[in-house]
Design a protein with these regions (language model features):
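Structural preference for solvent-exposed beta-strand-turn elements
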Residues: 1-370
Length: 370
């Protein structure tokens, strides 16, 4: 096995595939990166849950395969000078040279590296990388970390003729994003759930460009193809929340506010809230005004934010982080807040145009004196 390539390109590929490498595994090969030099140079990382494979432009003089420990391999390449890296392998002994630097390290038998799952092409979705990245980033925060409901530790993908919808829920909040897509193949409509950990890596792989990203749904796995990189993940099985029924649609109070102004007010009041000093926000929706206050063991805080609309003096409590997460994710300068009572959810929507995002935050019961 022998090849040479640019240090920067190899370093980027190692960084990408390392995200799917097991830091500790009963299978030593899974702590490494599989290198395959054939018609092209491929690097693969796999932790039995998620696999990432990427192709690196390289001059391949001799074909071969080998597994190298991801941490050491990454450290070596990162510290090499910015020059052409030459890689030679004789059985499991690897020689790496770049400029005046030279390393000889031991690799692992590639036969010990499990094969990535094969994803049968059942249904496919094509959309821009920028759009997919934004949709994931604006819903991933609401994925549950509660393993008692494994299905909600991932995001629901729903595709139909209207486009792609991604939904995340964690029992306290719901995040939904909808966008038109470039192409859909397969069934008229289909859905699947992707683990949040895998989606976090997809978000990193995607760039803010109009280049296409492809999502392929298989029977048990799903594949994301982004440029020269692909990610394979198992699908989560189970019954996802019937989210349409969970969203209140006949709210009696509608107010409109500036997203940044709302965030700034909540952020200021939240300064006296911490993990050790937890307290809900007391939000009072008056005529054209939102009053926000809280009280903890170290003191109290109060702020006001202008709104458009009459809240009728409704008083409701919220977890400050959940409300801020929703507002930060909202891809709009202004948002519409819909409420009904102090014990019903708050729904955050666009002020006009297509309803391409929706966030729902459940209230927190307020105690006297809070």
């Amino acid at each position: 096995m022998k090849f040479s390539c640019e240090k920067a390109l190899l370093q980027a590929a190692i960084s990408t595939t390392s995200r799917a490498v097991s830091p500790k595994s009963s299978i030593p090969a899974l702590e490494g990166i599989l290198l395959e030099a054939g018609n092209e140079l491929r690097l693969t990382g796999y932790n039995l849950e998620t696999g990432i494979r990427t192709v690196v432009p390289a001059d391949i003089q001799q074909e071969g395969t080998l597994v190298l420990g991801a941490r050491l391999f990454g450290d070596i390449i990162r510290k090499l000078p910015d020059d052409i890296v030459t890689f030679r392998a004789d059985h499991y002994m690897v020689n790496i040279t770049c400029g005046m630097s030279e390393f000889n390290i031991l690799g692992t038998d590639p036969e010990e590296f499990p094969e990535l799952p094969t994803v049968e092409y059942q249904n496919t979705i094509t959309l821009s990388q920028a759009k997919l990245r934004a949709m994931i980033g604006q819903t991933l925060f609401a994925v549950s970390d509660n393993e008692s409901r494994p299905i909600h530790t991932g995001s629901l993908f729903e595709a139909d003729d209207k486009g792609l919808t991604i939904v995340s829920v964690d029992g306290y909040r719901l995040a939904l994003r909808h966008e038109a897509i470039d192409k859909k193949e397969g069934a008229e409509s289909f859905s699947f759930v992707v683990p949040g950990a895998a989606l976090s890596e997809v978000e990193k792989i995607c760039s803010d460009v109009d280049e296409p990203a492809q999502i392929i749904q298989g029977a048990r796995h799903v594949m994301f193809k982004v440029g020269s990189t692909m990610l394979v993940s198992r699908r989560l099985e189970g019954e996802f929340l019937a989210y349409r029924q969970a969203i209140p649609r006949n709210n009696t109070i509608h107010v409109v506010g500036d997203t940044r102004a709302l965030l700034a007010s909540i952020d200021r009041v939240s300064l006296i809230i911490s993990d050790k000093l937890k307290s809900p926000l007391r939000c009072t929706f008056d005529h054209n005004l939102l009053k926000i206050s809280t009280k903890t063991a170290i003191g109290d805080a109060y702020d006001e934010c202008p709104l458009e609309g009459d809240g009728g003096g409704l008083e409701i409590g919220f977890n400050n982080k959940y409300l801020m997460d929703a507002l930060k994710a909202a891809p709009a300068d202004r948002v519409r807040l819909e409420l009904t009572t102090g014990v019903s959810p708050c729904v955050i929507l666009p002020t006009e145009g297509e309803e391409n995002f929706l966030y729902m935050v459940l209230p927190v019961r307020l105690k006297a004196g809070e």
